[in-house]
Structure formats: structure tokens, C-alpha cells
């Protein structure tokens, strides 16, 4: 399936029929997901959808189910270009099933710091690996007829103050690290759309940044397509239009109201020709997607395709990385475990399949690790489960033992125009839960009152947790027991379930009925509310005293002691690792509970295995106390099956780390410069400024600088174990022309089972200079081998990959001399080196 060829005459014909006012209206969304249409003028709409690991459709939470694919950090861990392309192809099917033709993906920003809240959505700390995988993802997506939207252009490496943070990045670091994955993917796969980032880059917001949009994207790279803002990420009228932002999303517009744009056109700040150019790019996207011939937006459907289930399971297992396997405790063979007991601890009954935010998906189903292992090992193995640790960030919503004002299960929500909920409400609804998320709501009320009658089944001093976008209070039998007196300090955290809530206790008597109310008012408008500005919102969590104070750790240790194997499933739920917030700790949540669980179980059972589901590196203070560790990332809806496949040996692990795992957060290259420092602005507000002081020395480029730095790495970039062993021989490299280098190495599987090795090629000057990395990834290949089999891996890379940007000359430059080609199985495990001589080169961007 290919895109329609654009007929310039058709575009100009449609454009000529539109008034200036209508052209302006085309430059902002009609609603949250669709573009503006003018059916009477022959202009159809097009629908967009999140996101990188599943086409969610128009509903942020709930809604029509969709396939949930592995997160991009897992996809990167496969080091498999074909896998990335297949995921893209399948996502195109999913996107169409939601009536959309534009998928808001992939995300290719760099893993600058392990605490980056959105790292899991992106591929790697290495721009070459990220760019290559993104290019194949886009080829798969667009080859199947759906437009890709590469994002977030550029340098969206943190979530803290993401709408306003000013990032100071040298031009060299910007070009070599942060723009490079975009450049590779755009030049190799030509995505139809680019989404700008929220942040400020060197003093100018990305959506109005002439250097990024005009000079580099459309100028140097020659890209022709549609540039859209991130949702709520437009920050100006004239500047963004002139810089090249074609489409403000979502609608209704905040910055492109017709009268306001007409005013800047009349003043000469924006030329009418610029409006035409922006509108033309919108129309060309519609033409490429066949919207003119087929303007209908179909209803959303849930299509649970068996081929997608198989793909998700396969790619999920390929991306799992075996970090430790002492004494070959893995794989867990069925014949060995017959009549044995296996302890399943931690998140064994919860499938951690995705991170939070726009990557959230209402999956068709979720396979838990327990379900996957029971299916794989059968009834001959005895399993025993214990939770082991409290990991909640917020108390679960209060939905048990409550009835609304009509006596039905749930809550009554009354909405009022005024901030005081007096008199008759303007609207009332019934809700299963005491929560109101206003993201897709058109009406902006002054206040909301949630009411229910609660009859506890247990006496005790039970716990509440509450938050609201604006001032809020909790009442029991008319008495205020807690009051939030200010706006929520983190509106995105509220939206995505990551805002910190105080815990309030209240004594209840079993069998007695209590009137529970929450009153929340519209927040005082301020910077930072973004899409939630002017809307009410609240949530109320609850947990009994018995459950809250339960000694889960002792229960888990007892189970581990009486088991032959103990498997601890650790990780991040979507409210701990999410868009909108950077993580609060390098340690697993919450408050050290998971670290204590692993350490205690490791001490109780000598055969302890840890399976960690996070999208990022985490601290592992218990590493020496366990036999095996598997990094499982976020594997998608088949999580439990993919994990079981690797644990039982049905699949030989072949994943390799796309990021470095530091020993401590202080060892991260960006430590001390993340998320930045606050300064007082002229507008009497605090502004976050961050300087990328590490320059080009991101990830392994930093650790490679010295032995002292290398000692700070727990697991290096490119690392991963297998159930078999591979050897390399006959390392060769030669410059076949002035522009290319060919590398070859013989790979042999000397073990007893089939597997896949990832051959990695790094290159750098033999005589390294302090301002340049020692070596950088320039190529890779995944080689599948049967026991005893040998294959030759052939990898070609371009000489210009070795150039560095010189700010003084404004050119990419390569000095003549000897260069070392390092071939290996990780950035640290180099199996052979070959020297080649190269001539000097330089070229303009």
C-alpha cells in the first residue's frame, strides 16, 4: 500500500477556493485528534492517534481496545531492523482500525539521563542505533499506508518543566547527538510529518525555532512534509507561522484564532504567502493519504489480530536482555522443575506492559508473568504467589462498598457554574469511581461535588489519598477532614496518575454508613497547566488500615524459603514511569520496598531470579545476592508469554542493552545537569535552565573516556548474555572507496543451543583527541546460528559517520590518519580490532 502521488494542480485548485480565513482555520486542529475540514470546498479532515506502542484511538483512558506492542526501549534492545519494520507494519493496521491515518510516532529523542520520564518511548542513548531503528519503523508504517510523525523535534530529553525548560546545547552536541537520529530517519524513510517538542532550545521554543525548522529540517535536510506541534506545544502566532509550524494541535486553537492571525497578516508580521505555504502543506498531507477521494473517518474498532499477537510475543522475547546467569540457573527447564515449587513474587500477577502518558493503551488483553509461566510449565510445577512489597504511588480509587445518591454502586458527580457548589447543579452524572479527568471535556465548570455513601466491612483507621487540579476538600458526614488549599503543583502528574498525594486517616466502624464528599473548584489560571488550564479535576483514593499496614515482605520471604526457585518480578507501573514527569529516584519504587524485597528473598533462597520491567536502567543494590537477572523492559500485551519463553528456554535471549546501566545515579554523565537549575525571570516566575555540559559525551561515549569512568558502569552499552556461546574470528576491515568501509567477521556458535549474536562495530581515531569520543557505533548485525554453525557478518558503514562537526568552520570534518575499527559483542567486549588509513574530508551540513 503506497501513498497517493500529489497533483500540484489539484492542491492549487483547492487552495484557490479557500478564503484567507478558511486557510487560517486549516492551520489548527478541529478537535483533539482531527484536522479542520471544509466539505463544501472539498477539504476533508484527517484523524491522528497516539502512539509509539499502540494506536489508542480518541479516548485517553478506556475506550475501544487496541493491540499493545513492546515499548521502543525493548525494540531497541532487539538490535533487529526487521523487527522494527514489522512493528511499523502492524501499527499501520492498528491505526486504520481506529479510523486514523496519522500515527503520532516514533519518538527518537536520546536517553540523556536514566531518570528521563519518557525514555521508554525512545530507543537509545546512541543516535545511530535510534535513527536506524526509527527509519525501519517508519518504512513499515508508511509502507502500509499510514503517515508517521517523528517526534519530538528536538531535544525533549526531560519531562520536568517540559513546556518551558530552556536547554542550552552546543551546536556540535545538537548536531552529533540530538538531531542525528532525526536526520538518519528522515533521510532514509521520509516520514510525512514531524512533531515539534515542547521545550526551548537555546532560547527559542522548538515550534518557532528557525534554526531547527527552516535552516536544518527544510533547508539542509531538504525535507518536505507537515510540521505539527505537540499537543498544547504552540507558543506564538507570528513566530511559529514564519518558522514553519504548519499545524497547531489540538483544536480548538489557542494561538491561531482567525482574527488574531488576520491582524498579524495585516501588520505585515506574517505574509499571506506564508499562510498559503502552511495551508498547502496541510492539503498535501491530505492528498498523500487519499483523504480527498476517501474523506470518511471510520468508527473505531477493536480487531484482535492473531498475527499481531504472535509478532508482539516474538519481538517481546527478542528484546529481553539476560544480564546475569550465575551457575546457569536459567533456563528453567520443565523436566528439571517437575514436582518442584516455584515462588512467584512481586509483580507476578500484574503485567507491566507499557509506560504512562501517550503510550498508554487499553490493551486487548494482558498476559501476566504468572499466566505465562503456568502455561509454559504446566501442572507438574507447583507455584506459590506473594506480593512482597507495596508499590502503589497513589491509593487505588475508592470504589468498593460505596453507593451513589440514587442507591446504585458508585458515585454521584454534580457540576456547578460557580466555585461554590450551592443550589441546583448545572449537570449531574453517575460514575463508578471518584475521579474526574477533564482532558476531552468541552465544558469548563466552576466546581464539582462527588458524593457517595460508604459502608465499611472492617473497622479501623483507614487511609484516603486525594488531589485536585484546583482547591479541593474531603468531607465525611459534613466535616472537612482534609483541604488542598492551592492548585495542584503538577498538573500533568495529576492527569497521568503521578502526583504525590498526602495520606489522610479517619476512624471507621464496620457496618456503619458514612456520607463521603469531595468538592473541587476550577484552578486559578497559571503557567504550566497547559491543556488543563481552566478545567476542574479530582481523584479520591482509599485503602483499609489492614491492607495498608500489611507485612508483605515477611509473607514473601516465607514463600521463598519453602520454594526451590524464587522469581521476583520488579518494575515500574505507568504512574511511576510516565510522560509528564521525570522519575523521582534511580531505585525501584516505592521507598525502597522492591529493593528490600529482592535482597530479603535473595538471602532466603539461593536460587533467586529477578525479572525487571522498566523502560530504563535502575539501581540494583541486590545484584550480588541473586543468581540471575533479566531486563524485560515493557514487553506489550504478551508480556507474560514473552518472559516465560525466555525464562524456560523456549527462546534463547538475544537482547542487547541500547543504553548503559550506571552503578549509581551519580555516575550518569548528565548528573548534576539534570533536570537543571531554576532562575527568577522578568515575569516574576521561576524558569528552569539546563545546560548539556557533557556535550557529545553521552552514555558510553562518556564511560569510554577512562578506566575510572568505565568502572562506574554496571552493565555496558550493547551487553547481553545468551544460553549459548559465540566466538569471533577473522576480523577484517577495509576502505573500499573514499566514502565507505567494509567490515567482516566470522561468528561461530560454540554452544549447545541455537541463538543469535549481535555483532557491533565501533570506530574512532587511533590517536584519540580529548574533544572526540574514543569510539562510536557505526554498524551492527544480528546473526542467527545453530549449534556449531559459522556465518560471516558483513557490515558496511560510511566514512562520513566518523566526521565531527566543527563549530568554528561550520563543517563536518575528518582528519587524515589511522582509524581503529573495533568489532565486538558490546562496547566493552571487543573481540578484535583492525586499523585502516583514511584521508581528510569535510563537507557542509
From Swiss-Prot:
Q: What is its EC number?
A: 3.2.1.21
List each coiled-coil range: none
GO molecular function: any one? beta-glucosidase activity
Q: Please give the SMART domains that the UniProt record associates with this protein.
A: Fn3_like
Zinc-finger in keyword set:
no
Q: What class of enzyme is it?
A: hydrolase
Residue positions of the active site: 230
| Keyword annotations of the record | Carbohydrate metabolism, Cellulose degradation, Glycoprotein, Glycosidase, Hydrolase, Polysaccharide degradation
pH dependence, entry free text: Optimum pH is 5.5.
User: Per the database record, which ranges form the PA14 domain?
Assistant: 406-557
UniProt-annotated glycosylation sites, renumbered to this chain: 202, 235, 591, 612, 794
| Thermal profile of function | Optimum temperature is 52 degrees Celsius.
Q: In which pathway does it act?
A: Glycan metabolism; cellulose degradation
Q: Does the keyword Heme apply?
A: no
Q: What's the stated role of this polypeptide?
A: Beta-glucosidases are one of a number of cellulolytic enzymes involved in the degradation of cellulosic biomass. Catalyzes the last step releasing glucose from the inhibitory cellobiose.
State the similarity comment: Belongs to the glycosyl hydrolase 3 family.
The protein in question is named Beta-glucosidase B
Organism this protein belongs to: Emericella nidulans (strain FGSC A4 / ATCC 38163 / CBS 112.46 / NRRL 194 / M139)
- Underlying gene: bglB
Amino acid at each position: 500500500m503506497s501513498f497517493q502521488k500529489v497533483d500540484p494542480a489539484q492542491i492549487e485548485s483547492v487552495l484557490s477556493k479557500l478564503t484567507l480565513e478558511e486557510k487560517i482555520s486549516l492551520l489548527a486542529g478541529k478537535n483533539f485528534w482531527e484536522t479542520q475540514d471544509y466539505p463544501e470546498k472539498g477539504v476533508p479532515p484527517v484523524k491522528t492517534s497516539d502512539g509509539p506502542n499502540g494506536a489508542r484511538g480518541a479516548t485517553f483512558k478506556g475506550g475501544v481496545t487496541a493491540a499493545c506492542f513492546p515499548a521502543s526501549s525493548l525494540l531497541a534492545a532487539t538490535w533487529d531492523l526487521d523487527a522494527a519494520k514489522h512493528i511499523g507494519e502492524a501499527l499501520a493496521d492498528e491505526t486504520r482500525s481506529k479510523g486514523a491515518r496519522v500515527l503520532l510516532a516514533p519518538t527518537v529523542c536520546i536517553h540523556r539521563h536514566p531518570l528521563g520520564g519518557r525514555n521508554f518511548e525512545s530507543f537509545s542513548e546512541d543516535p545511530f542505533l535510534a535513527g536506524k531503528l526509527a527509519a525501519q519503523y517508519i518504512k513499515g508504517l508508511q509502507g502500509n499506508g499510514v503517515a508517521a510523525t517523528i517526534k519530538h523535534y528536538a531535544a525533549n530529553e526531560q519531562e520536568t518543566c517540559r513546556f518551558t525548560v530552556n536547554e542550552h546545547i552546543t551546536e556540535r552536541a545538537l548536531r552529533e547527538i540530538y538531531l542525528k537520529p532525526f536526520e538518519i530517519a528522515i533521510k532514509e524513510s521520509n516520514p510525512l510529518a514531524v512533531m515539534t517538542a515542547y521545550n526551548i532550545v537555546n532560547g527559542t521554543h522548538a515550534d518557532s525555532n528557525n534554526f531547527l525548522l527552516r535552516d536544518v529540517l527544510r533547508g539542509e535536510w531538504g525535507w518536505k512534509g507537515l510540521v505539527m506541534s505537540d499537543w498544547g506545544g504552540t507558543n506564538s502566532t507570528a513566530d511559529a507561522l514564519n518558522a514553519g509550524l504548519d499545524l497547531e494541535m489540538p483544536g480548538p486553537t489557542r494561538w491561531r484564532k482567525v482574527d488574531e492571525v488576520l491582524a498579524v497578516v495585516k501588520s505585515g508580521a506574517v505574509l499571506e504567502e506564508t499562510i498559503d505555504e502552511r495551508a498547502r502543506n496541510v492539503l498535501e498531507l491530505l492528498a498523500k493519504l487519499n483523504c480527498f477521494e476517501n474523506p470518511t473517518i471510520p468508527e473505531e474498532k477493536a480487531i484482535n489480530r492473531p498475527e499481531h499477537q504472535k509478532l508482539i510475543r516474538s519481538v517481546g522475547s527478542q528484546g529481553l536482555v539476560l544480564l546475569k546467569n550465575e551457575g546457569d540457573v536459567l533456563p528453567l527447564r520443565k523436566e528439571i522443575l517437575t514436582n518442584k515449587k516455584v515462588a512467584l513474587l512481586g509483580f507476578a500477577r500484574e503485567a507491566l506492559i507499557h509506560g504512562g502518558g501517550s503510550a498508554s493503551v487499553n490493551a486487548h488483553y494482558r498476559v501476566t508473568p504468572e499466566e505465562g509461566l503456568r502455561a509454559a510449565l504446566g501442572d507438574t510445577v507447583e507455584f506459590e504467589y506473594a506480593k512482597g512489597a507495596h508499590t502503589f504511588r497513589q491509593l487505588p480509587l475508592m470504589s468498593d462498598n460505596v453507593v451513589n445518591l440514587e442507591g446504585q454502586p458508585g458515585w454521584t458527580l454534580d457540576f456547578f457554574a460557580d466555585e461554590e457548589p450551592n443550589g441546583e447543579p448545572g449537570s449531574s452524572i453517575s460514575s463508578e469511581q471518584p475521579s474526574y479527568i477533564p482532558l476531552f471535556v468541552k465544558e469548563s465548570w466552576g466546581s464539582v461535588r462527588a458524593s457517595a455513601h460508604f459502608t465499611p466491612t472492617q473497622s479501623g483507621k483507614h487511609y484516603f489519598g486525594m488531589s485536585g487540579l484546583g482547591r479541593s476538600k474531603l468531607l465525611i458526614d459534613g466535616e472537612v477532614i482534609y483541604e488542598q488549599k492551592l492548585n495542584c503543583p503538577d498538573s500533568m502528574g495529576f492527569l497521568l496518575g503521578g502526583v504525590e498525594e498526602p495520606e489522610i486517616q479517619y476512624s471507621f466502624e464496620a457496618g456503619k454508613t458514612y456520607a463521603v464528599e469531595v468538592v473541587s473548584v476550577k484552578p486559578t489560571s497559571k503557567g504550566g497547566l497547559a491543556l488543563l488550564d481552566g478545567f476542574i479535576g479530582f481523584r479520591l483514593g482509599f485503602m483499609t488500615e489492614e491492607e495498608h499496614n500489611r507485612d508483605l515482605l515477611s509473607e514473601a520471604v516465607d514463600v521463598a524459603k519453602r520454594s526451590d526457585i524464587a522469581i521476583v518480578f520488579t518494575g515500574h507501573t505507568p504512574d511511576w514511569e510516565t510522560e509528564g514527569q521525570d522519575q523521582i529516584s534511580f531505585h525501584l519504587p516505592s521507598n525502597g520496598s522492591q529493593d528490600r524485597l529482592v535482597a530479603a528473598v535473595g538471602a532466603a533462597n539461593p536460587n533467586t531470579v529477578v525479572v525487571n520491567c522498566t523502560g530504563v536502567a535502575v539501581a540494583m543494590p541486590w545484584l550480588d545476592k541473586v543468581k540471575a537477572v533479566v531486563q524485560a523492559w515493557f514487553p506489550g500485551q504478551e508480556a507474560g508469554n514473552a518472559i516465560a519463553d525466555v525464562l524456560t528456554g523456549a527462546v534463547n535471549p538475544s537482547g542487547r542493552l541500547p543504553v548503559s546501566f550506571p552503578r549509581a545515579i551519580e555516575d550518569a554523565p548528565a548528573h548534576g545537569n539534570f533536570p537543571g537549575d531554576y532562575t527568577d525571570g522578568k515575569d516574576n516566575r521561576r524558569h528552569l535552565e539546563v545546560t548539556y555540559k557533557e556535550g557529545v559525551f553521552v552514555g558510553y561515549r562518556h564511560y569510554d573516556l577512562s578506566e575510572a569512568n568505565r568502572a562506574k558502569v554496571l552493565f555496558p552499552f550493547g551487553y547481553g548474555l545468551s544460553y549459548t556461546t559465540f566466538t569471533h574470528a577473522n576480523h577484517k576491515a577495509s576502505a573500499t572507496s573514499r566514502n565507505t568501509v567494509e567490515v567482516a567477521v566470522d561468528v561461530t556458535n560454540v554452544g549447545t543451543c541455537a541463538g543469535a549474536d549481535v555483532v557491533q562495530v565501533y570506530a574512532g581515531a587511533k590517536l584519540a583527541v580529548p574533544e572526540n569520543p574514543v569510539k562510536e557505533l557505526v554498524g551492527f548485525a544480528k546473526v542467527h546460528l545453530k549449534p556449531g554453525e559459522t556465518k560471516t557478518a558483513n557490515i558496511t558503514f560510511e566514512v562520513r559517520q566518523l566526521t565531527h562537526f566543527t563549530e568554528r568552520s561550520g563543517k563536518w570534518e575528518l582528519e587524515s590518519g589511522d582509524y581503529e575499527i573495533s568489532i565486538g559483542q558490546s562496547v566493552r567486549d571487543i573481540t578484535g580490532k583492525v586499523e585502516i588509513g583514511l584521508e581528510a574530508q569535510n563537507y557542509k551540513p
